[in-house]
């Protein structure tokens, strides 16, 4: 399976380098801004987003927060040349960001991180599918349980109607 990854950076040189790095193994979509990335996410089923943190109109974390509604299963990696420790800690602790890497990055480390992120994507996707299947099966089990309960109620009423009366007065009346 060839995964589709999106790279977002407002520095054209970084976009070109990252695209060349990943194009042999993945389908790569690039965007020079957060706004363009959001528009492209409506058109592409992206498994992984790699974004620069410091961009002009929208930070990488702001972009990632906005992508949750569009692509909730997408895994996100943040690249940063500057350390805004508070924002990074918040993004990591909330589960918004899978990993963050500093610029300049090591190509081998980045490839390894991307590979692991895509493994994580598969696990999360499977978890989501299994959760939906579990929900469907629970609903079906509830339906079956309701039908069984109704059937038992009918059997109980049928037994009551078929049982001989327990009061001797009834026999006297019936003769």
Regions found by a protein language model. Give the residues of each.
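The feature encodes the CheY-like receiver
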Residues: 15, 56-57, 80
């Amino acid at each position: 399976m060839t995964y589709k990854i999106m790279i977002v950076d407002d520095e054209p040189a970084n976009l070109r380098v990252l695209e060349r790095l990943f194009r042999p193994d993945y389908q790569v979509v690039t965007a020079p801004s957060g706004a363009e990335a959001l528009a492209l996410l409506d058109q592409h089923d992206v498994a992984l987003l790699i974004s620069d943190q410091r961009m002009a109109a929208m930070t990488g974390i702001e972009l990632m927060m906005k992508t949750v509604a569009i692509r909730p299963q997408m895994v996100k990696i943040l690249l940063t040349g500057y350390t805004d420790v508070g924002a990074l800690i918040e993004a990591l602790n909330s589960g918004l960001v899978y990993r963050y890497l500093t610029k300049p990055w090591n190509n081998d480390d980045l490839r390894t991180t991307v590979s692991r992120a895509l493994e994580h994507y598969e696990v999360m996707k499977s978890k989501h599918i299994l959760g939906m299947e579990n929900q469907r099966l629970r609903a079906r089990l509830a339906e079956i349980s309701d039908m069984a309960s109704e059937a038992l109620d009918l059997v109980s009423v049928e037994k009551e109607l078929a049982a001989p009366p327990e009061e001797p007065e009834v026999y006297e009346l019936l003769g």
